[in-house]
Amino acid sequence: MDINEILQYLPHRYPFLLVDRVLEIEEGKRILALKNVTMNEPFFPGHFPHHPVMPGVLIVEAMAQAAALLSFKSMGVKPDENSVVYFAGIDNVRFKRPVVPGDQLLFDVVITQSKRNIYKYKGVARVDGELATEAELTCALKTLS
């Protein structure tokens, strides 16, 4: 799935769209997605000027965006002005290594549970095969009035 298709499934836009490509997707099960981290990211000038590091919360947000892509593709629907996926919870987050300009983050996210409109996931983010971040995520699909 290239960026043009991703834009059909996620409402996020620059500077908050954090998934560049989907490499693999098994609907209802798993997604493998990536984010190319460059020095041009808007957060690097302030985090940190002398040693740029991607904020951990944005790594987790990117993981959640990959999870949302998996959910929408699995349901066979595209979001519209009447639906949104909310990030509802994060558990057991661990940051194992810093992510810096030039890194390519690879997100591997699996659905562990789904009930009605609530989805739970287990996700990991790796750089060059090395674990950078892991987390358990909960998202809720909400239909707006």
Swiss-Prot record:
Assigned EC number: 4.2.1.59
Keyword Cytoplasm tagged: yes
Catalytic activity: a (3R)-hydroxyacyl-[ACP] = a (2E)-enoyl-[ACP] + H2O
Subcellular localization: Cytoplasm
Matches recorded under InterPro entries: FabA_FabZ, FabZ, HotDog_dom_sf
CDD domains with a match to the protein in the record: FabZ
One GO cellular component, as annotated: cytoplasm
GO molecular function: (3R)-hydroxyacyl-[acyl-carrier-protein] dehydratase activity
Any GO BP annotation: lipid A biosynthetic process
Catalytic class of the enzyme: lyase
Active site as annotated: H47
UniProt keywords, alphabetically: Cytoplasm, Lipid A biosynthesis, Lipid biosynthesis, Lipid metabolism, Lyase
Main location group: cytoplasm
Family: Belongs to the thioester dehydratase family. FabZ subfamily.
Function of the protein: Involved in unsaturated fatty acids biosynthesis. Catalyzes the dehydration of short chain beta-hydroxyacyl-ACPs and long chain saturated and unsaturated beta-hydroxyacyl-ACPs.
Protein name: 3-hydroxyacyl-[acyl-carrier-protein] dehydratase FabZ
Organism expressing this protein natively: Aromatoleum aromaticum (strain DSM 19018 / LMG 30748 / EbN1) (Azoarcus sp. (strain EbN1))
UniProt gene name: fabZ
